[in-house]
A protein has these predicted regions:
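Acidic, polar ligand-binding/catalytic clefts
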Residues: 73-99
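Sec-dependent N-terminal signal peptides
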Residues: 4-14
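Serine endopeptidase catalytic core focused on the charge-relay Asp
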Residues: 104
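Sec/Tat signal peptide C-region and signal peptidase I cleavage site
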Residues: 16-20
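Exported/periplasmic ABC-transporter solute-binding proteins
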Residues: 21-47, 60, 64-65, 70, ...
Length: 264
Protein backbone atom coordinates (compact mmCIF):
# COMPACT_ATOMS: atom_id res chain seq x y z
CA UNK A 1 0.00 0.00 0.00
CA UNK A 2 2.84 2.35 0.90
CA UNK A 3 4.47 1.66 -2.47
CA UNK A 4 1.23 2.48 -4.28
CA UNK A 5 0.85 5.77 -2.40
CA UNK A 6 4.47 6.64 -3.13
CA UNK A 7 3.93 5.94 -6.83
CA UNK A 8 0.83 8.15 -6.93
CA UNK A 9 2.73 10.93 -5.13
CA UNK A 10 5.62 10.62 -7.58
CA UNK A 11 3.31 10.85 -10.59
CA UNK A 12 1.82 14.11 -9.32
CA UNK A 13 5.33 15.54 -8.92
CA UNK A 14 6.04 15.19 -12.64
CA UNK A 15 6.28 18.86 -13.78
CA UNK A 16 5.18 18.58 -17.42
CA UNK A 17 2.06 16.97 -18.82
CA UNK A 18 3.18 14.50 -21.49
CA UNK A 19 0.47 15.70 -23.89
CA UNK A 20 1.93 19.21 -23.74
CA UNK A 21 5.14 17.85 -25.27
CA UNK A 22 3.29 16.73 -28.39
CA UNK A 23 3.19 19.12 -31.33
CA UNK A 24 0.55 18.95 -34.01
CA UNK A 25 1.02 20.47 -37.47
CA UNK A 26 -2.19 21.09 -39.40
CA UNK A 27 -1.04 20.86 -42.99
CA UNK A 28 -2.24 20.89 -46.55
CA UNK A 29 -2.10 17.45 -48.16
CA UNK A 30 0.35 18.45 -50.91
CA UNK A 31 3.25 19.06 -48.51
CA UNK A 32 2.62 15.76 -46.71
CA UNK A 33 2.22 13.81 -49.95
CA UNK A 34 5.41 15.32 -51.36
CA UNK A 35 7.39 13.55 -48.63
CA UNK A 36 8.82 16.83 -47.35
CA UNK A 37 7.95 16.28 -43.68
CA UNK A 38 9.60 12.85 -43.53
CA UNK A 39 12.72 14.45 -44.97
CA UNK A 40 12.71 17.73 -43.04
CA UNK A 41 11.34 17.16 -39.53
CA UNK A 42 13.95 14.57 -38.41
CA UNK A 43 16.58 17.29 -38.93
CA UNK A 44 15.01 19.36 -36.13
CA UNK A 45 17.22 19.30 -33.02
CA UNK A 46 14.48 18.15 -30.64
CA UNK A 47 12.77 15.75 -33.04
CA UNK A 48 13.47 12.76 -30.79
CA UNK A 49 12.40 14.59 -27.62
CA UNK A 50 9.05 15.91 -28.81
CA UNK A 51 6.44 13.91 -30.67
CA UNK A 52 5.53 15.82 -33.85
CA UNK A 53 2.40 14.70 -35.66
CA UNK A 54 1.24 15.98 -39.05
CA UNK A 55 -2.48 16.03 -39.87
CA UNK A 56 -2.86 16.45 -43.64
CA UNK A 57 -6.19 17.71 -44.96
CA UNK A 58 -7.32 20.36 -47.42
CA UNK A 59 -6.41 23.95 -46.59
CA UNK A 60 -9.98 24.84 -45.60
CA UNK A 61 -10.25 21.96 -43.14
CA UNK A 62 -6.75 22.58 -41.77
CA UNK A 63 -7.71 26.18 -41.00
CA UNK A 64 -10.93 25.09 -39.28
CA UNK A 65 -9.01 22.59 -37.19
CA UNK A 66 -6.51 25.25 -36.12
CA UNK A 67 -9.34 27.64 -35.25
CA UNK A 68 -10.62 24.91 -32.92
CA UNK A 69 -7.20 24.76 -31.19
CA UNK A 70 -6.45 21.41 -32.80
CA UNK A 71 -2.91 22.24 -33.88
CA UNK A 72 0.19 24.16 -32.83
CA UNK A 73 1.32 25.17 -36.31
CA UNK A 74 -0.64 25.66 -39.52
CA UNK A 75 0.97 25.14 -42.97
CA UNK A 76 -1.35 25.88 -45.90
CA UNK A 77 -1.40 27.61 -49.29
CA UNK A 78 -4.14 30.20 -49.53
CA UNK A 79 -2.79 33.62 -48.57
CA UNK A 80 -6.20 35.29 -48.42
CA UNK A 81 -7.52 32.81 -45.90
CA UNK A 82 -4.22 32.84 -44.00
CA UNK A 83 -4.40 36.62 -43.54
CA UNK A 84 -8.04 36.34 -42.50
CA UNK A 85 -7.01 33.73 -39.91
CA UNK A 86 -4.41 36.17 -38.57
CA UNK A 87 -6.74 39.19 -38.55
CA UNK A 88 -9.25 37.28 -36.42
CA UNK A 89 -6.60 36.56 -33.80
CA UNK A 90 -6.25 32.84 -34.42
CA UNK A 91 -2.54 33.17 -35.21
CA UNK A 92 0.29 35.15 -33.61
CA UNK A 93 3.04 34.81 -36.24
CA UNK A 94 3.07 34.13 -39.97
CA UNK A 95 6.01 33.22 -42.19
CA UNK A 96 6.26 32.74 -45.96
CA UNK A 97 7.70 29.24 -45.79
CA UNK A 98 8.29 28.25 -49.41
CA UNK A 99 6.67 28.01 -52.83
CA UNK A 100 6.30 25.81 -55.86
CA UNK A 101 3.82 26.09 -58.73
CA UNK A 102 0.62 24.72 -60.19
CA UNK A 103 0.43 22.83 -63.48
CA UNK A 104 -2.35 21.72 -65.81
CA UNK A 105 -2.37 17.98 -66.48
CA UNK A 106 -4.06 16.24 -69.40
CA UNK A 107 -3.87 13.40 -71.95
CA UNK A 108 -0.57 12.99 -73.79
CA UNK A 109 -2.34 12.99 -77.16
CA UNK A 110 -3.93 16.41 -76.54
CA UNK A 111 -3.74 18.69 -79.59
CA UNK A 112 -5.53 21.72 -78.16
CA UNK A 113 -4.84 22.68 -74.53
CA UNK A 114 -1.09 22.26 -74.98
CA UNK A 115 -1.21 25.22 -77.41
CA UNK A 116 -2.57 27.59 -74.76
CA UNK A 117 -0.78 30.90 -74.21
CA UNK A 118 -1.89 31.31 -70.59
CA UNK A 119 -3.77 29.41 -67.91
CA UNK A 120 -6.92 31.42 -68.64
CA UNK A 121 -6.59 30.50 -72.31
CA UNK A 122 -6.33 26.83 -71.31
CA UNK A 123 -9.36 26.98 -69.02
CA UNK A 124 -11.35 28.86 -71.67
CA UNK A 125 -10.61 26.12 -74.22
CA UNK A 126 -11.66 23.43 -71.72
CA UNK A 127 -14.90 25.29 -71.02
CA UNK A 128 -15.72 25.97 -74.68
CA UNK A 129 -15.02 22.40 -75.85
CA UNK A 130 -16.52 20.85 -72.70
CA UNK A 131 -13.47 18.65 -72.14
CA UNK A 132 -13.73 16.54 -69.00
CA UNK A 133 -12.19 18.47 -66.13
CA UNK A 134 -11.78 17.08 -62.62
CA UNK A 135 -11.98 19.60 -59.77
CA UNK A 136 -11.01 18.72 -56.22
CA UNK A 137 -14.00 20.75 -55.02
CA UNK A 138 -12.88 20.36 -51.42
CA UNK A 139 -12.08 23.94 -50.27
CA UNK A 140 -8.37 23.13 -50.50
CA UNK A 141 -5.75 25.68 -51.55
CA UNK A 142 -5.55 24.05 -54.97
CA UNK A 143 -9.32 24.21 -55.35
CA UNK A 144 -9.28 27.92 -54.40
CA UNK A 145 -6.55 28.59 -56.97
CA UNK A 146 -8.56 26.77 -59.65
CA UNK A 147 -11.71 28.77 -58.84
CA UNK A 148 -9.69 32.00 -59.05
CA UNK A 149 -8.87 31.18 -62.70
CA UNK A 150 -12.54 30.63 -63.53
CA UNK A 151 -13.42 33.94 -61.85
CA UNK A 152 -10.87 35.76 -64.00
CA UNK A 153 -12.77 34.43 -67.01
CA UNK A 154 -16.16 35.32 -65.45
CA UNK A 155 -17.16 31.70 -65.97
CA UNK A 156 -19.11 29.42 -63.67
CA UNK A 157 -18.02 25.83 -64.31
CA UNK A 158 -20.64 24.63 -61.84
CA UNK A 159 -23.23 24.84 -64.62
CA UNK A 160 -21.48 21.85 -66.16
CA UNK A 161 -21.29 19.90 -62.90
CA UNK A 162 -21.70 16.17 -63.46
CA UNK A 163 -21.36 16.59 -67.21
CA UNK A 164 -17.92 17.84 -68.21
CA UNK A 165 -17.00 19.51 -64.88
CA UNK A 166 -16.52 16.67 -62.39
CA UNK A 167 -16.28 17.52 -58.69
CA UNK A 168 -14.41 14.82 -56.79
CA UNK A 169 -14.57 16.26 -53.27
CA UNK A 170 -11.31 14.41 -52.62
CA UNK A 171 -7.60 15.06 -52.20
CA UNK A 172 -5.05 15.51 -54.95
CA UNK A 173 -4.04 11.86 -55.33
CA UNK A 174 -7.57 10.44 -55.70
CA UNK A 175 -8.53 13.35 -57.97
CA UNK A 176 -5.55 12.69 -60.23
CA UNK A 177 -6.57 9.03 -60.42
CA UNK A 178 -10.05 10.06 -61.55
CA UNK A 179 -8.67 12.42 -64.22
CA UNK A 180 -6.36 9.72 -65.57
CA UNK A 181 -9.13 7.10 -65.59
CA UNK A 182 -11.52 9.42 -67.45
CA UNK A 183 -8.84 10.74 -69.82
CA UNK A 184 -9.59 14.22 -68.50
CA UNK A 185 -7.82 17.38 -67.38
CA UNK A 186 -6.91 18.53 -63.89
CA UNK A 187 -5.23 21.46 -62.11
CA UNK A 188 -2.56 20.23 -59.69
CA UNK A 189 0.36 21.41 -57.62
CA UNK A 190 3.62 20.23 -59.17
CA UNK A 191 4.86 18.26 -56.14
CA UNK A 192 1.77 16.04 -56.12
CA UNK A 193 2.20 15.32 -59.83
CA UNK A 194 5.90 14.52 -59.42
CA UNK A 195 5.12 11.97 -56.71
CA UNK A 196 2.04 10.56 -58.46
CA UNK A 197 2.79 7.12 -59.90
CA UNK A 198 -0.32 6.34 -61.97
CA UNK A 199 0.49 8.83 -64.75
CA UNK A 200 -0.27 6.39 -67.58
CA UNK A 201 -0.88 8.53 -70.69
CA UNK A 202 -1.05 11.90 -68.89
CA UNK A 203 1.50 14.71 -68.77
CA UNK A 204 1.88 18.41 -68.00
CA UNK A 205 0.21 20.39 -70.80
CA UNK A 206 0.62 23.90 -69.43
CA UNK A 207 3.09 25.35 -66.92
CA UNK A 208 4.38 28.80 -66.06
CA UNK A 209 6.23 29.14 -62.76
CA UNK A 210 5.60 32.87 -62.40
CA UNK A 211 1.97 32.87 -63.49
CA UNK A 212 1.09 29.83 -61.40
CA UNK A 213 3.22 30.45 -58.31
CA UNK A 214 1.95 28.53 -55.29
CA UNK A 215 2.98 30.08 -51.95
CA UNK A 216 2.92 28.12 -48.69
CA UNK A 217 2.45 30.07 -45.48
CA UNK A 218 3.21 28.90 -41.94
CA UNK A 219 1.31 30.26 -38.93
CA UNK A 220 1.92 29.87 -35.20
CA UNK A 221 -1.48 29.26 -33.61
CA UNK A 222 -2.43 31.69 -30.82
CA UNK A 223 -1.70 29.97 -27.52
CA UNK A 224 -3.62 32.67 -25.61
CA UNK A 225 -6.82 31.35 -27.18
CA UNK A 226 -5.83 27.72 -26.78
CA UNK A 227 -4.72 26.73 -23.30
CA UNK A 228 -3.95 23.19 -24.50
CA UNK A 229 -1.03 24.37 -26.67
CA UNK A 230 2.53 24.48 -25.37
CA UNK A 231 3.84 27.85 -26.56
CA UNK A 232 7.49 27.13 -25.76
CA UNK A 233 7.72 24.04 -27.94
CA UNK A 234 5.47 25.49 -30.65
CA UNK A 235 7.56 28.66 -30.92
CA UNK A 236 10.83 26.76 -31.02
CA UNK A 237 9.68 24.55 -33.91
CA UNK A 238 8.17 27.55 -35.71
CA UNK A 239 11.44 29.48 -35.39
CA UNK A 240 13.46 26.53 -36.64
CA UNK A 241 11.21 26.02 -39.66
CA UNK A 242 11.63 29.76 -40.37
CA UNK A 243 15.43 29.57 -40.10
CA UNK A 244 18.08 29.60 -42.82
CA UNK A 245 19.02 26.06 -41.79
CA UNK A 246 15.54 24.72 -42.54
CA UNK A 247 15.36 26.81 -45.74
CA UNK A 248 18.56 25.21 -47.01
CA UNK A 249 17.15 21.75 -46.35
CA UNK A 250 13.93 22.64 -48.20
CA UNK A 251 15.95 23.89 -51.19
CA UNK A 252 17.80 20.58 -51.38
CA UNK A 253 14.72 18.37 -51.33
CA UNK A 254 14.18 16.67 -54.69
CA UNK A 255 11.80 14.21 -56.33
CA UNK A 256 12.70 12.44 -59.58
CA UNK A 257 15.83 14.62 -59.74
CA UNK A 258 13.74 17.80 -59.63
CA UNK A 259 13.52 20.47 -56.97
CA UNK A 260 10.12 20.41 -55.29
CA UNK A 261 9.99 23.63 -53.27
CA UNK A 262 11.77 26.97 -53.50
CA UNK A 263 12.57 29.79 -51.08
CA UNK A 264 12.15 33.48 -51.93
Amino acid sequence: MRKILYLIFFIFLIPINVSSENLLIQSTTSTRDSGLYKYLLPKYTYYNDIKIKVIAVGTGQAIKNAENCDGNILIVHDKGRELDFMSKGYGVKRHELMYNDYVLIGPSNDQDISKSKSITDAFSRIHDKKYKFVSRSDSSGTHSAELAVWRRLSLNPGTGSGKWYLESGQGMGPSLNIAVALNGYIFSDRSSWLRFKNKRNHKILYENKQELKNNYGMILVNHNRCSNLNYKYSLDLFNWLSSDEAANHIRKYRLNNQNVFYID
